């Protein structure tokens, strides 16, 4: 679904930006790459992530993340499913690393989708909120 050549093109940006994330929602989206429910759900979750973590989340559910090794080594993650991207975003926001969003093409998936829209959306939403609450508790204790 992600074009490898698009990823190669963004690598030089790592010199100035420690975290790059592919923004599928600002396109271009290939026809049939994402249905309306998933598109709207991604927009909603990204808006929630932006509000809760107070940093821009153009496409919080993107699976295309590129970051410097020094940033990766500071991450503490425990997610196993589709909420991993939300946890990545929340952890980076807590570390003060606002992602740089790079528009990338997104193609239609070959084969069956693994995502269950509503259930995974709820898990992602929960992860975004829980990580923010936990971070706030650490700060105020």
Give residue ranges: language-model regions:
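Aromatic/hydrophobic pocket-lining residues that form π-stacking "cages" and hydrophobic walls in ligand
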Residues: 10, 88, 128
